Amino acid sequence: GLMDMVKGAAKNLFASALDTLKCKITGC
């Protein structure tokens, strides 16, 4: 459903943001 898509997109966005933050802090 639509809510599942929204939740999935939010989860992906959050995960990629977390990865970016981790890269900034620890270096990739």
UniProtKB/Swiss-Prot annotation:
One of its GO terms (cellular component) is extracellular region. The keyword Secreted applies. It is found in: Secreted. Pfam families: Antimicrobial_2. One of its GO terms (biological process) is defense response to bacterium. Expressed by the skin glands. Keywords: Amphibian defense peptide, Antibiotic, Antimicrobial, Disulfide bond, Secreted. Disulfide bonds join 23-28. Its main location: secreted. Has antibacterial activity. Belongs to the frog skin active peptide (FSAP) family. Ranatuerin subfamily. This is Ranatuerin-2AVb. It comes from Rana arvalis (Moor frog).
